[in-house]
Structures are given as C-alpha cells and as structure tokens.
Amino acid sequence: MVPRPDARRKERAGERKVVKTPTWHVYVVGTRDGALYTGVTTDVARRIAEHSAGGRGARYLRGREPLEIVYRRRLGERGLALRVEWRLKRRPRADKLEIVASRLSRRALLRRLEVTEQR
C-alpha cells in the first residue's frame, strides 16, 4: 500500500515528529441487574457514554442502564490491555467481584491474572 501524500511525515532538518501513542485502560461496568461487562478503551468516559447511548456500545449492555464504572485500570499498551481483558472475561464472577472490591493496582492485577508485560 502506497501512503497518501498527506499522510507522509513532514520533517525538517534536525526535527523529528513525536507520535503520541494512546494509553489503554481495562474497565468493568456494573449494570442495574448486577451484570458485569469488561472492555478496553483509550477513553473510559467516552466509551461509557457510547455504551449508554446505544449505537456504538456493546449489544450486551443495551437495556441494562444505568451503567456504572466499578473498576478501571490504566495499562498502557493496547496488546497488554487486550490480554488483561481476555483473562478477566474468563474469570468466574466471584473472582471479578473480588478484583473490583479490592481495587487491585496495575501490578497486582497483572500478577493475579498471570499476565506479563512482555508478549
């Protein structure tokens, strides 16, 4: 694929363009009926608003409002966030509730889910 002319890097002699990579979060949403939903995003508030509005939100959450963020943790890279989400979604409900209640730190969450930062 050939890059579009407007997508090419514009650099001047001695200057580098700094590309800011987004910080990814894992979050757990609680619903009116006590269900838990786990997801990842770069902007938790925006994503919850999308879930609440319907259109771009998860089908699982439709009709389950009000939604409440019960847990969120900043993880950094997208790959790490996806691995944590995958492990968290496969945990029994009791484990998820314990993680939410204990407010595990990033390091403790990774250790608990047996996820390493390196792939």
Predicted feature locations:
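GIY-YIG nuclease catalytic motif and its immediate N-terminal context
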Residues: 1-56, 62-75, 79-86, 103-119
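Short arginine-rich
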Residues: 86-101
